[in-house]
Swiss-Prot record:
Compartments it resides in: Plastid, Chloroplast
Molecular-function annotations in GO: RNA binding
PANTHER family according to UniProt: MATURASE K
Name of this protein: Maturase K
Upper lineage: Eukaryota, Viridiplantae, Streptophyta, Embryophyta, Tracheophyta
Pfam families: Intron_maturas2, MatK_N
This protein's record includes keyword Metal-binding: no
Protein family membership: Belongs to the intron maturase 2 family. MatK subfamily.
Gene Ontology terms: cellular component: chloroplast
HAMAP family: MatK
Domain of life: Eukaryota
Organism: Triticum aestivum (Wheat)
């Protein structure tokens, strides 16, 4: 009990910096110039259709909120204010998005500054198992081969809007900000229909990317807080005769096992278990739990996660969202790669004096391949090819100049090769390059009233250079002074780039 209280207090020590003395101070935007609504252009004022807003507009709206009874008049007389005037769609969307994005910026400031102003006496210890997302790549290369079972987790959402607000109460103790958050969430959907309406979730996520990302990260952080605590406790179980599990509000103790107490529900018991080698990796909405334990231990972890989501976060999730597989006999989809750990045989001939014999050695190899069907589906959705992979023209780009068209196709191709450079089999990437090249030729050919073959012959090396230039330059700079490296023969070489996390959604460059 005392151990968990100390662990929880260290987690709560950050929360005092989330108390806002004044919500939306007039010049609060000046403290976060890098978190502007428009990225590198914080003063640009663009229309609502472009989804870009100026920090100046946010400030003006914040000043309006300081006016007396602004929100009260908005609720009592919705037709007198543009924010709630549903008859005027442009102003309704424009002002609501400005307000939601501005709210997200203000909430993000304490999170970004908590390390700078955290007192030394309350400094939170750094755990070795909490590392950067870039540690995913060495984990795959070095440690994945020594594990046996893998649980592929699709982190469920949505959850009820009120649950999102309640989760923030542990970190944000400013009541007006929570009321404003409820106000913004109510604006986009009905409280009762949100949990069943995927359309409302899609609209909210699309129109309020920053706010949705903050709410989702808060939810995932709370879920991982419990997961980390249980993981730390499980490593000490053989030395303990009893244990406790604590719910954040209501605490309970039971010898030799722990119980979870929830108001309105019966007691649910989850037994302690020991898993000596457990690895947890999350990327966006997917996570994996890999271990060297038994299948029974993986089922217990699955049971724990389902009960955690059901009784603490108050929403039901399907057990099929957690897949338990044996690494030697299955593959899994993570970060856009289709990965597996197959076993291969290596025959070694050994000779001792006059006797010779063969040694069959079983070796594990981490294999990553590109999901060809999925990427061709993306290209088909973006109208670069048919569903079967046959290249077609892109008529929507015919109004652009020739070099702009070449640059767009080349950039998409380079992004694909850059992101999937960690693949051990790159033949699929060359097939995608072939599709993009022909699609580019079919787009430019009719524009110049020429056939595809004649147009490709007319462009010659310039056309090919636009698709190969970036690869040759990158690899020549990396390996020219160290070792001989030929990209054209590197179909099985894996090179992980740390900046691929910036282009994680490959649908965006295709649109």
């Amino acid at each position: 009990m005392e151990k968990f209280e100390g662990y929880s207090e260290k987690h709560k020590s950050r929360q005092q910096y989330f108390v806002y003395p004044l919500l939306f101070q007039e010049y609060i935007y000046a403290f976060a110039p890098d978190y502007g609504l428009n990225g590198s252009e914080p003063v640009e004022i663009v229309g609502c259709n472009n989804k870009k807003f100026s920090s100046l507009l946010v400030k003006r709206l914040i000043i309006r909120m300081y006016q007396q009874n602004f929100l009260d008049n908005s609720v009592n007389h919705p037709n007198q204010d543009r924010l709630l005037d549903y008859k005027n769609y442009f102003y309704s969307e424009f002002y609501s998005q400005i307000l939601s994005e501005g709210f997200a910026i203000v909430v993000e400031i304490p999170f970004s500054l908590r390390e700078l102003f955290c007192p030394k006496e309350k400094e939170i210890p750094k755990f070795q198992n909490l590392r950067s997302i870039h540690s995913i790549f060495p984990f795959f290369e070095d440690k994945f081969l020594h594990l046996d079972y893998l649980s592929h987790i699709e982190i469920p959402y949505p959850i009820h809007l009120e649950i999102l607000v309640q989760l923030l109460q542990y970190r944000i103790q400013d009541v007006p900000s929570l009321h404003l958050l409820r106000f913004l969430l109510n604006y986009y959907s009905n409280w009762n229909s949100f949990i069943t309406s995927m359309k409302s979730i899609f609209i909210f996520k699309k129109e309020n990317k920053r706010l949705f990302r903050f709410l989702y990260n808060s939810y995932v952080s709370e879920y991982e807080f419990f997961l980390l605590f249980l993981r730390k406790q499980s490593s000490c179980l053989p030395l303990a005769s009893s244990g406790t599990f604590l719910e954040r509000i209501h605490f309970s103790r039971k010898m030799e096992h722990f119980g979870i107490m929830y108001p309105g529900f019966s007691r649910k018991t989850l037994w302690f278990f020991m898993d000596p080698l457990m690895h947890y990796v999350r990327y966006q909405g997917k996570a994996i739990l890999a271990s060297k334990g038994t299948f029974l231990l993986k089922k217990k972890w699955k049971c724990y996660l389902i009960n955690l989501w059901q009784y603490y976060f108050c929403f039901w999730t399907q057990p099929r969202r957690i897949h338990i597989n044996q690494l030697a006999n299955s593959c899994f989809d993570f970060m856009g790669y289709l990965s597996s750990v197959p076993k291969s045989s290596l025959l070694v001939r050994n000779q001792m004096l006059e006797n010779s014999f063969l040694i069959d050695t079983r070796m594990k190899k981490f294999d990553t391949i590109v999901h060809a069907t999925l990427l061709i589906g993306y290209l088909s959705k973006a109208q670069f090819c048919t569903g079967s992979g046959h290249p077609i023209s892109k008529p929507i780009w015919t109004d652009l100049s020739d070099w702009d068209i070449l640059d767009r196709f080349g950039r998409i191709c380079r992004n694909l090769f850059h992101y999937y450079s960690g693949s051990s089999k790159k033949k699929t990437l060359y097939r995608l390059k072939y599709i993009l090249r022909l699609s580019c030729a079919r787009t430019l050919g009719p524009k110049h009233k020429s056939t595809v073959r004649a147009f490709m012959q007319w462009l010659g090396s310039v056309f090919l250079e636009e698709f190969f230039r970036e690869e040759e330059q990158v690899f020549s700079l990396m390996f020219a002074k160290t070792t001989y490296f030929s990209f054209r023969g590197s179909h099985s070489e894996r090179i992980w780039y740390l900046d691929i996390l910036r282009i994680n959604d490959l649908v965006n460059p295709l649109n």
